[in-house]
Amino acid sequence: METVKLFLDTNIVLDFYTGRLGNDDAQKIVTAGQDSRYELCISILTAINVLYVSGKYAPGLQASDIPKLFSILPMDYQQYCKALSLNINDFEDALQISCARANGCRAIVTRDRALLNCGISFPGILSPEEFLHRIGGTR
């Protein structure tokens, strides 16, 4: 069985580590990621942002904790240039899409409404609820 690379947007990872609103869905998604059918992926940008923000909300989080649960994907100049060519107002969203595409991710899970409705062709840009429904983990 092929492992599906699932890209998590920064907001999902922050929900997981900080207990923000939606933490239940984030917990379920990370639990699903422990199944060998999925590889949970995040960009290096997400890892950096989560460490920065979590200092206030999850002070015990260490940089070494993140790769225990998530594959950290590289970002490079080529992805940066591709992100510039996407017709998206939020450049960070464009970078995330570019990173996910370059690294073979099959879907992006995000709580960001602008990203969910950006109109970019990608195999799947899903809300946490949509993803959990697809795998049978609905509430």
Which positions does each model-derived feature cover?
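Short, flexible helix/strand-to-coil boundary loops that buttress conserved ligand/catalytic motifs
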Residues: Y17-T18, S54, N87, G119-I120
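Helix-adjacent hinge/juxtasegments
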Residues: Y52-P74
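Acidic, PIN/NYN-like endoribonuclease modules and their adjacent C-terminal/linker elements
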Residues: A102-R139
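Structured helix-beta-strand junction loops
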Residues: S36-R37, K68-L69, L86
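Substrate-recognition element of Asp-dependent hydrolases with the DxDx(T/V) motif
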Residues: E39-L45, V50
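Active-site neighborhoods of divalent-metal-dependent phosphate/nucleic-acid chemistry enzymes
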Residues: S71-N117
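A generic structural signal for short hydrophobic patches within well-formed alpha-helices
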Residues: V13, A47, Y80, L115-L116, ...
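Short, well-structured N-terminal submotif of metal-dependent ribonuclease cores
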Residues: M1-C41, K56-G60, E129, H133-R139
